[in-house]
C-alpha cells in the first residue's frame, strides 16, 4: 500500500486516460524525463527513494541522463517482475493477493474461491459429524437394550455372585446346566418306577356295575311292595282309622343322593271333615320309616278332598353305592312304606 501512495505522488498534473490500476502503475509516462524536468529537482529524490524501495540503483553525476535511464530501466524491470507476481495468470476475479507471495503464483486465493472451498469443507465436516452422531446414538441404544436384557436375566437366576455383566452371564449358564441335569435325573427316576410297578387289570367302573346292582334293588323293592300290599289287603278298617287312599307317588332326583318326593292322598270322609290332619302324620311316619333315607325337609298341604305332602330325602351315609339308587327304586320304597302305615292304593294310583 505504501508503494501505491508513492507512485500517486509522482503522477503528472494532467490525468492520463482511464486505464486499469495495474497498467496505470506500469505506464512509461510516469518516468518521462521531460515531465520530471518541468516539475523540478525534487523528482530525483523521489526517484532515488523509489529505487531504494525496489532495490534499483540510480546513475552517478557524470551521466545524469544515463543514470536516470539506467535507474529507471532497472526499476522498470523490477516493477514488471513485481507486477507479474501480483497479477498472476488469472482473471481479475481470480487475482491472488500481493504482499506475502513469493513470486511463484502460489499466493493466497481470492475470497470467492476461499468461500467455495470453505463451503465444501463445511459440508464434508457436517456430513462426518452427522454420521458420527448416528453411530454414537445407535451404539448407545444397543447398550441400553443389552443392559435391560441383563437385568431380566439377573432377576430370573436365583444365585448371582457378582453384579457385573460377565458374572451374570456365567451364573446363568451354570444355572441352566443344573436345571438340565435335574430334569434328566427326574426322567430316569420316573422310568425306573414305571418298570418296577406291577401291571394290574383296571377295576370295573361304577357305570359298568350299576346295571348289575340296580335290577337287584328294583326286584327287592318290588317284592317288598307286594308283601306290603298283601298285608294291607288283610288289614281291617280298625287297624287303619284314617282310611286314606294313595292317589299319586312321584320322585325326582335333584342331586347326587338327593330326591324330591311328592305324595298325594285322598282322605276318608271322617278324615276329610277333620281337615285332613289325621293323614299328614301317617305320611311322614311312613317316609321316616325308610332307614336308607334321611328327611331333610317336608311340607304338607291339606284340602277337604286331598292331602299333598312334599319331602326332600337324602340317601344316608351307610349306603355304599349311592349311584345305584334310582328314582324308580325310591318310588317303590315310599309306596311300600305307605301301605305298611295302613294307606290303601287306589285302582288308578300313579307312580311317576
Curated annotation (Swiss-Prot):
PROSITE patterns: BHLH
Disulfide partners: none
Region ranges (Basic motif): 130-143
UniProt induction comment: Strongly induced by iron deficiency in roots, but not in shoots.
Secreted among keywords: no
Domain bHLH, residue spans: 130-179
Subcellular location: Nucleus
Main location: nucleus
Function of the molecule: Transcription factor involved in positive regulation of genes involved in strategy II iron acquisition, including genes for mugineic acid (MA) family phytosiderophores biosynthesis, and genes involved in S-adenosylmethionine cycle and iron transport. May play a role in the regulation of iron deficiency response by promoting the nuclear localization of IRO2. Possesses transactivation activity in yeast.
UniProt record similarity statement: Belongs to the bHLH protein family.
Protein name (Swiss-Prot/TrEMBL): Transcription factor BHLH156
Species in which this protein is naturally found: Oryza sativa subsp. japonica (Rice)
Amino acid at each position: 500500500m505504501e508503494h501505491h501512495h508513492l507512485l500517486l505522488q509522482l503522477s503528472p498534473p494532467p490525468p492520463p486516460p482511464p486505464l486499469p490500476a495495474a497498467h496505470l502503475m506500469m505506464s512509461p509516462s510516469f518516468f518521462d524525463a521531460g515531465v520530471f524536468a518541468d516539475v523540478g529537482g525534487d523528482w530525483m529524490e523521489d526517484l532515488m527513494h523509489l529505487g531504494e524501495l525496489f532495490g534499483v540503483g540510480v546513475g552517478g553525476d557524470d551521466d545524469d541522463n544515463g543514470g536516470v535511464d539506467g535507474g529507471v530501466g532497472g526499476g522498470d524491470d523490477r516493477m514488471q517482475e513485481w507486477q507479474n507476481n501480483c497479477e498472476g495468470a488469472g482473471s481479475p476475479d481470480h487475482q491472488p493477493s500481493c504482499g506475502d507471495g513469493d513470486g511463484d503464483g502460489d499466493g493466497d486465493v481470492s475470497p470467492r474461491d476461499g468461500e467455495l472451498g470453505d463451503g465444501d469443507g463445511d459440508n464434508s465436516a457436517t456430513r462426518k459429524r452427522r454420521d458420527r452422531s448416528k453411530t454414537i446414538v445407535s451404539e448407545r441404544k444397543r447398550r441400553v437394550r443389552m443392559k435391560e436384557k441383563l437385568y431380566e436375566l439377573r432377576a430370573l437366576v436365583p444365585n448371582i455372585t457378582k453384579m457385573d455383566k460377565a458374572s451374570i452371564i456365567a451364573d446363568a449358564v451354570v444355572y441352566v446346566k443344573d436345571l438340565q441335569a435335574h430334569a434328566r435325573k427326574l426322567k430316569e427316576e420316573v422310568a425306573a418306577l414305571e418298570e418296577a410297578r406291577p401291571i394290574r387289570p383296571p377295576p370295573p367302573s361304577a357305570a359298568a356295575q350299576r346295571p348289575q346292582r340296580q335290577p337287584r334293588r328294583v326286584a327287592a323293592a318290588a317284592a317288598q311292595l307286594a308283601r306290603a300290599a298283601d298285608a294291607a289287603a288283610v288289614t281291617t278298617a280298625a287297624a287303619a282309622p284314617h282310611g286314606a287312599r294313595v292317589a299319586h307317588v312321584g320322585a325326582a332326583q335333584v342331586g347326587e343322593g338327593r330326591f324330591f318326593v311328592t305324595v298325594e292322598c285322598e282322605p276318608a270322609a271322617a278324615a276329610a271333615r277333620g281337615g285332613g290332619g289325621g293323614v299328614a302324620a301317617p305320611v311322614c311316619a311312613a317316609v321316616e320309616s325308610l332307614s336308607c333315607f334321611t328327611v331333610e325337609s317336608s311340607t304338607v298341604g291339606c284340602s277337604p278332598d286331598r292331602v299333598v305332602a312334599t319331602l326332600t330325602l337324602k340317601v344316608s351315609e351307610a349306603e355304599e353305592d349311592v349311584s345305584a339308587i334310582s328314582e324308580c327304586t325310591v318310588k317303590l320304597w315310599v309306596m311300600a312304606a305307605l301301605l305298611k302305615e295302613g294307606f290303601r292304593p287306589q285302582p288308578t294310583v300313579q307312580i311317576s
